[in-house]
Amino acid sequence: MVMNNLNPTDFTPWPEQFSQRYREQGYWQQRTLFDYFSDSVKKSPDAIALIDEFGQYSYQNLYQKMISLAAGLSSLGLQRGDNVVLQMANRAEFYLCFFALTMRGIKPVLALPAHRYLELSYFCQHTQAKAYIFSDDIVGFDAQQTAQKLRSSCPSLLHTIVCGQSSHEQIQELDTLYHCAEDDPVTDSVFADQVAFFQLSGGTTGTPKLIPRTHNDYAYSVLGSIQICQFGPQTRYLCVLPVAHNFPLSSPGALGVFYAGGCVVLASDTTPHTAFRLIEKHHITVAALVPPLALLWMKYAESATENIASLTLVQVGGAKFSEAAAMRLPTALHCQLQQVFGMAEGLVNYTRLDDPLSVIVTTQGRPISADDEVMIINDEGEPAAVGEEGLLMTRGPYTIRGYYRAPEHNQRSFTEQGFYITGDRVRRTAEGNIIVTGREKDQINRGGEKIAAEEVENLLLQHQDVHDVALVAIADEFLGERSCAIVVPDNGKTLKPITLKRFLHAQGLAEFKIPDHIHFVDELPKTPVGKVNKKWLRTQYSH
């Protein structure tokens, strides 16, 4: 029987016959995310687990601080079943909060540093969050001012907690919550079938959808990734990407490093200079990058003076990595390339470490699990032949069956048989490797950050001088895609791009969602059935 901490209308469980199979196959081991961390503490308590710009922590140090923080959070009245929005820069406190919350059955919503008031208020209201925990060192963001605004607009929000120095009496400092606690944390009321936390979808409509991840499914994804990527106590992993992203959290990411007994090193910024300095200083062996960062690293390496000989593996994912760039990377960085194609909703594909170079360069790999069911449907609605392009659908032991509190969206995103409709267009080789060819959903992938066109369009339409608008992706050599807004002004009004960009900023939209380009036209082109012809717009404005 599945024990869960959400209302049945909020969470879509796996059907019992699937749950039973996943348990029998050993995928779901009925242990919490914190249980696996505790295993590493017992094996190597004095080993260094984490290094950030402020210091380093052994496994035992982290363990004790997690338990202490969990006690402090409980003293505020936070309890099993509550939701908390967590937004942190790349620092140790992210993992301390993540484990302190999940070990008590409190579910963090993993907001990204790029999110602003518009997204954060939605997360708080949609989940009825009891607390907002944040760091005050997110570049270009007055988080404490935003916290005050959230406190006023979200009735459920009882606590705002800052990692840093508080500037307001209603904002509590995280450092005051490290309470004395017993060595053994209270986890007896937390079941592995329960939702542990929420991740965020890229989304194609409105604000991001919330992805409920259970202890069982997420742990299996991490453990399977560890095996494929051969992480172990010797692994020294550089986290350059935002810590809350699925890729650097679980593929195998920081959780994979912790569970394998290795060491995570956090970069405070994304510059190659910082990364290469950390690689040399801490003898980094593995790093995970999105394509734009991989290109920057390759360029920087041409004149770099740092010694990065310890680096043995670079993972590239989050967006399609061009074949030409993939071919160059092993030589440019003197290490192995691994392509990763995954999604926060579940399915993750890897090229294997022993794959031929031709496979690593030209494909995005194959799934973690033998029970990852992958269907590719062609334009006629039939299963695609080998090598034929089609729409990717999937279900499996770590792919969700529904978004949180989104019944209408779930009807569009999941089939009656429980397959998740990814929106990715792919081909599959005879060996089972997947090649990503594009997107079917109305979504822009800007260097790994997903933008729902409809969300930005709806905000622009709120401007009094905008009559109509279409947001499309245009190809970009560096980011993969950039966003381009084609705007029809109202009644011949004169508008400037900067005016609309300032308007979107004022609405609290995340910086990466602000259109890179804005063009003005008299009318938008239409298809024969009266829809905006975005295909024509993409072609027209890509030059």
Report residues per predicted region.
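Conserved ATP/PPi-binding loop(s) of AMP-dependent carboxylate-activating enzymes
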Residues: 367-371, 382-413, 451
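Conserved AMP-binding/adenylate-forming core of the ANL superfamily
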Residues: 29-30, 34-38, 46-91, 95-99, ...
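Structural core segment of the AMP-binding/adenylate-forming
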Residues: 3, 106-175, 493
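AMP-binding/adenylate-forming catalytic core of the ANL superfamily
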Residues: 115-122, 132-134, 287, 396, ...
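Gly/Ser/Thr-rich phosphate-binding loop
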Residues: 284-288, 298-359, 373
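Conserved beta-loop-beta connector loops within the AMP-binding
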Residues: 360, 375-393, 430-431, 493-497, ...
